[in-house]
Structures are given as structure tokens and as C-alpha cells.
């Protein structure tokens, strides 16, 4: 089935994964947890123990006011919801959530509050100059 994969430090991408439990678990690296934070018929599938096992923090989940209420650790993906099972993510939902999760995030505590700092996209990074000697 077609899903939108979101990995820590990377831009989201669409990919195909199997709909069986083993394939879902392989995609997140462990037992799965499905959460339903959106009005759209979409599930966010993540590693159930990602934070406990120390997987890298990935993206923040925000409420309607833009406030962070949770942070997903490790890989996660977005999948469509059928009548009684997961299904392909609709193209319009893939586009919407690819934009929402476009920028990788780093996290910091500031004045007792956790903030998410959007990181530049890989192609936006400034080239590194060599400081090994004079340029010719």
C-alpha cells in the first residue's frame, strides 16, 4: 500500500509497503502504535516504544493552535483508513502531510517548554568552505 514515510532528519517520501503486520513493524523498527490525530481518514503509524528505546526524535505533533503536544520518535508513516483496515494514502493527503512534515526538526527546552526548530532541507544547506589553506 502507498504510504508517506517520515524519517528523522529527512524529507518525507511516498513509498510502498505491505499491509501485513510484519511489514508495518519493519517500517518502524518494532511494535506499531496507530494514532489518529487528524480529521482526515489518516492514521499515523509509529514505533510503540520509540521514546523508551531511545530512537531519535523525529517530528512534533501540534494541536489546532500550533502548540506541541507530542513528539514522535523514530520512523513513522501516514496511511489511509479503510472501512476496517489500513489502505493507500490518498494523493491529496500525501501532498498535505508531505508539506506539513517537510522540514526535519530538532528539539530544545527553552524556559521550561519544549520547542521544535525546523532544519534546512538537504538541498538548502550552504556549501562548506575548506579552511585548510589559501584558495587558489
Where does each model-flagged region fall?
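N-terminal nucleophile
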Residues: 1-11, 15-121, 127
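Non-Sec secretion/translocation targeting segments of pathogen effectors
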Residues: 123-136
Amino acid at each position: 500500500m502507498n504510504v508517506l514515510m517520515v524519517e528523522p532528519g529527512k524529507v518525507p517520501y511516498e513509498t510502498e509497503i505491505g499491509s501485513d503486520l510484519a511489514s508495518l513493524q519493519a517500517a518502524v523498527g518494532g511494535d506499531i502504535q496507530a494514532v489518529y490525530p487528524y480529521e482526515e481518514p489518516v492514521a499515523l503509524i509509529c514505533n510503540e516504544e520509540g521514546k523508551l528505546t531511545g530512537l531519535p526524535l523525529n517530528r512534533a505533533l501540534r494541536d489546532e493552535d500550533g502548540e506541541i503536544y507530542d513528539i514522535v520518535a523514530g520512523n513513522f508513516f501516514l496511511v489511509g483508513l479503510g472501512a476496517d483496515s489500513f489502505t493507500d494514502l490518498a494523493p491529496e493527503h500525501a501532498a498535505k502531510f508531505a508539506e506539513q512534515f517537510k522540514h526535519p526538526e530538532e528539539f530544545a527546552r527553552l524556559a521550561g517548554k519544549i520547542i521544535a526548530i525546523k532544519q534546512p532541507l538537504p538541498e538548502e544547506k550552504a556549501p562548506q568552505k575548506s579552511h585548510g589553506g589559501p584558495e587558489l
